[in-house]
């Protein structure tokens, strides 16, 4: 059975140890930790912080994962930049360095999974968007693919050495935004891609039109190692509380049970951080009702 978890980007106004205790008290069995400027910043580690988090998580029997979606950690002016797809090799190296540090952090915390995404390409080219085939320059798309495929093997090697699984998340608006793009990345990486897991955000599937969500979960079963839970309304990429959008939460959880998924299913509600404790409690209530349905 999978474990219900919560992403700390939805508790960004809480101290990390307080967040772990709160989530455990609410019944969560895991925490997806998003390193950021005020939470386990891998560029400015605080003495004893990692060990304190690891010990408390163990005491509370919380399974941990590490998420790498911090908005402005690498650049205070540009959200989610630089990426692995930048024109500048130095910029690509900055993202790769952050990902390596996040892998190290996960290993030190005892977390088994690190999630990542491709980032947006500099000129907006998409690998897998249904409406991009006629508009994008195929040669430019191949150049972006070449960059991504060149950056992935060293990261996969580092993760393997540290005993951590990399989970790649298709993200709307980024170069790889659909499960089909993940499949293509794994194909292009060949044998090196065998270790790459899939991080599936069920809300994103409503944005990109990859539905029914339950069917996508079943098709992805063999590569699925991490799951994000959130609702989406009208196909707009804004994470919402369950019940505020179009997601059939019972369908999602039933599909995860049917495929015998064993990883974390982590609620991701970063836009609700201003009411983080209340949102985490509400989300758990929705999850419990859906599991009983």
Kindly give the residue locations of the regions a language model identified.
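Histidine-acidic metal/acid-base catalytic patches
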Residues: 1-5, 10-27, 54, 58, ...
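Active-site acidic/histidine proton-transfer and metal-coordination neighborhood
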Residues: 17-18, 59, 73-197
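Short, conserved active-site loops that position catalytic residues or coordinate cofactors/metal ions
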Residues: 26-37, 66-79
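Non-cysteine beta-strand/loop elements that form the S-adenosyl-L-methionine
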Residues: 33-34, 65-69, 116-117, 221-232
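Glycine-rich, proline-tolerant flexible connector loops at the mouths of alpha/beta enzymes
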Residues: 34-53, 118, 124, 237
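Short acidic, glycine/proline-enriched helix-loop-strand junctions
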Residues: 41-63, 132-134, 138, 164
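Residue-level preference for long, well-ordered alpha-helices that form the structural scaffold
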Residues: 42, 46-49, 88-95, 137-144, ...
């Amino acid at each position: 059975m999978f474990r219900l978890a919560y992403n700390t980007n939805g508790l960004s106004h809480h101290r990390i140890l307080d967040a772990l205790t709160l989530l455990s008290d609410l019944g969560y069995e895991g925490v997806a930790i998003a390193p950021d400027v005020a939470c386990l910043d891998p560029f400015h580690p605080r003495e004893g912080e990692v060990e304190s988090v690891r010990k408390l998580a163990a005491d509370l029997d919380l399974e941990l994962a590490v998420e790498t979606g911090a908005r402005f950690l690498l650049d205070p002016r540009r959200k989610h930049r630089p990426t692995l797809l930048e024109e500048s090799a130095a910029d690509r190296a900055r993202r790769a360095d952050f990902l390596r540090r996040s892998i190290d952090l996960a290993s030190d915390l005892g977390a088994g999974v690190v999630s990542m995404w491709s980032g947006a390409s500099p000129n907006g080219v998409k690998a897998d968007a249904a409406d991009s085939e006629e508009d994008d320059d195929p040669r430019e798309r191949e150049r972006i693919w070449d960059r991504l495929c060149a950056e992935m093997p060293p990261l996969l090697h580092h993760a393997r050495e540290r005993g951590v699984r990399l989970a790649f998340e298709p993200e709307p608006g980024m170069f790889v935004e659909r499960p089909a793009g993940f499949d293509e990345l794994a194909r292009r990486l060949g044998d090196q891609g065998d270790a790459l897991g899939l991080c599936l955000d069920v809300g994103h599937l409503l944005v990109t039109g990859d539905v029914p969500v339950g069917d996508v979960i079943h098709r992805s079963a063999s590569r699925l190692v991490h799951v994000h839970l959130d609702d989406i309304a009208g196909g707009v990429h804004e994470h919402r509380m369950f019940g505020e959008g179009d997601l059939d939460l019972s369908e999602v959880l039933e599909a995860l049970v049917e495929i015998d998924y064993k990883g974390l299913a982590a609620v991701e509600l970063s836009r609700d951080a201003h009411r983080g404790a209340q949102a985490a409690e509400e989300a758990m209530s929705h999850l419990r009702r859906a599991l009983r349905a």
